[in-house]
């Protein structure tokens, strides 16, 4: 992709964050923008590659898509299938299939972890517990086996870990320029 198109797409996507990111994050103690910035910062601090850092930042973009398209809501706790909506949105804008799959994979990772480690459920925020049922509930053994066999399995689990931890109050929002530049470079590297 050429640089001008990559800049235009990045500007469009980051405009979603600037315009709507300060909105309520489905009952969590932080805004959507704070949550997604924290997830990206955690990924970067742990040495994740650029696709993982961007996926951590974009993992809940499906919730922001409600402001640009009609979407089904989960009774005040977010957007139904936000993970798939986010994946489709990013793919349609030229992001890599791996990045899209990482965004999509953070919800199945929650379902998997509640299957594999029943105590994990107790660590979920109230909002995350409420959405779990709508998102398919605890995985069944056959689903879990297939999920474990996915080549991105370990990355999905990391994405979920950052998602769970990225709810710290009073954490300043960083300058988004480093993420914008990362997104532009990522898009320019796509065919």
Please place each PLM-identified region on the residue numbering.
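Metal-dependent phosphohydrolase cores
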Residues: 1-191
């Amino acid at each position: 992709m050429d640089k001008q198109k990559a800049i235009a797409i990045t500007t469009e996507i980051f405009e979603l964050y600037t315009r709507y990111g300060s909105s309520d994050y489905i009952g969590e103690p932080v805004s959507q923008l704070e949550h997604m910035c924290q997830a990206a910062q955690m990924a970067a601090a742990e040495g994740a590659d650029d696709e993982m850092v961007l996926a951590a930042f974009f993992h809940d973009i499906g919730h922001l898509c409600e402001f640009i398209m009609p979407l089904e809501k989960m009774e005040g706790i977010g957007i139904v299938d936000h993970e798939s909506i986010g994946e489709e949105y990013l793919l349609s804008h030229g992001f890599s299939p791996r990045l899209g799959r990482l965004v999509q994979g953070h919800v199945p990772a929650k379902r998997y972890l509640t299957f594999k480690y029943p105590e994990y459920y107790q660590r979920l925020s109230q909002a995350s517990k409420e959405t779990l049922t709508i998102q398919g509930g605890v995985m069944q053994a056959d689903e879990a086996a297939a999920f474990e066999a996915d080549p991105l399995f370990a990355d999905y689990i990391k994405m979920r870990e950052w998602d769970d931890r990225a709810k710290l109050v009073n954490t300043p929002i960083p300058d988004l320029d480093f993420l914008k530049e990362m997104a532009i470079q990522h898009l320019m590297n796509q065919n």
